[in-house]
Amino acid sequence: MRKITLAILAACLFVGSTAFAQVDDNDPGTTLVVAETKEIFVPNGFDDNDEVVVVLDGYLPDSCHKIAHHEAKYDPETGKFQVFQFARRYNVPCLPALVPYYTEVHLGMLPQGTYGIVSKGSNGEVEIGEANNAGPDDFLYAPVEHARVERDERTNKYFAIIQGRFTNTCMEWEEVKVINSGKSKELLPIIQMADRDDCQDQEIPFSWMVDLPNDDAAGRYLLHVRSLNGKSV
């Protein structure tokens, strides 16, 4: 499983899922429009046995717009996904202020290769590698369920906190690798099974702090946390 978290390394932090409730696409008195995407965040390290996810990040032009559904269409002739993030525009007086949004777009499992990602106002590219083994992951990853980014007010440095539940008493930490790839910060929380005879199935909550690269300019970055079972959350 992969955990996708969008973070702003600036004066404040923003993490979590899509920030707005979706609206009824048949809502009367509104107009369906395509929202503009400021940037497409693409995690690194997808293989052909992974569920591929990319993140659209942008702004709605004012408070009269509300995020709606999204669509992704693949063109085999160009090798590109055309992604549309729709929004509802309400015909009422509104506040002329930008409204941030971001959306996780699930593209499913893709064969090895390079795929273009095109959205209104932005484009990107996702590389799909060949899996090294027949299983869902290259390593045994911790079953991470939540991730957040915080800043140490004393040192002004950023760190991530990953949380989840071990499901066996013999699960233990081996290491957490940090891969810094520009706009994408990838965490590989690798665990191992202790060689003991008393292993039992039991849920054991964990919380682990990981230092993040702190040499980047202020802005928006994608925190990509690997987790058990080769999917995206």
Which ranges hold each PLM region?
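Bacterial N-terminal signal peptides
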Residues: 7-16
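Exposed, flexible binding/inhibitory loops of compact, secreted disulfide-stabilized domains
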Residues: 20-233
